[in-house]
Amino acid sequence: MQSELQRGFVLHRRPYSETSLLVDLFTEESGRLTVIAKGARAKRSSWKSVLQPFTPLLLRWTGKSTLKTLTKAEPAAITLPLQQIALYSGFYVNELLTRVIESETPNPALFQHYLKCLTGLATETNIEPTLRLFEFQLLQILGYGVDFLHCAGSGEPVDFSMTYRYREEKGFIASLVKDNLTFYGRDLLAFEALDFSDDAVRQAAKRFTRIALKPYLGDKPLKSRELFTQNILLLK
């Protein structure tokens, strides 16, 4: 039985039986796991307001199977105030973690990246650099090794002004072809430095992470992306 409280966040929650919840958690020391929160849907349950996304929590659970039983959950701090686009971006980040990281695999570094990402979403006016940085950090932790500094075909250093075409599992090859897989050398150098201060670089980074994350996500569309699109259309 786990004795120490762990820091963590709710990634997703869904009904389980008449009064309980199944909750996907991301914790600092145990990684991602799923717990049953018994009675959390009951009218008088204090967990109903506690088990919310973007609230830093202190958690305890028990159980040896892949499905644990939550025994304690209390706020460690106030809920991070994500609103409008930042809120949907937070749902997107949560869905990424739910879909691509293995269950019960400790990753304290990723937890810190996630915490900084949520803080950035809550405080920054322009959230795009925060999102791109987290996506690249996630790819690094997943073991996605791409050389942004050298041409995969020749081994020559990437030239700032040249264009390069991405080839899965190989890297970037100098190319005059211009399509969705083509990137400028200046973009690749910025990717390596994790520098997303330039708008054109951010657009290129967004395009690249969609390509790079696809093998991990498969063909199933992201629900958070669909929800964001639907709500943007409603606001127009």
Swiss-Prot record:
InterPro entries: ARFGAP/RecO (IPR037278), DNA_rep/recomb_RecO_N (IPR022572), NA-bd_OB-fold (IPR012340), RecO (IPR003717), RecO_C (IPR042242)
GO biological process: DNA recombination; double-strand break repair
Signal sequence residues: none
Keyword list, A-Z: DNA damage, DNA recombination, DNA repair
This protein's GO CC annotations: bacterial nucleoid
Pfam families: RecO_C, RecO_N
Coiled-coil features, chain-numbered ranges: none
NCBIfam families associated with the record: reco
HAMAP family: RecO
Family the UniProt entry places it in: Belongs to the RecO family.
Function: Involved in DNA repair and RecF pathway recombination.
Protein's name according to its UniProt entry: DNA repair protein RecO
Organism: Haemophilus influenzae (strain ATCC 51907 / DSM 11121 / KW20 / Rd)
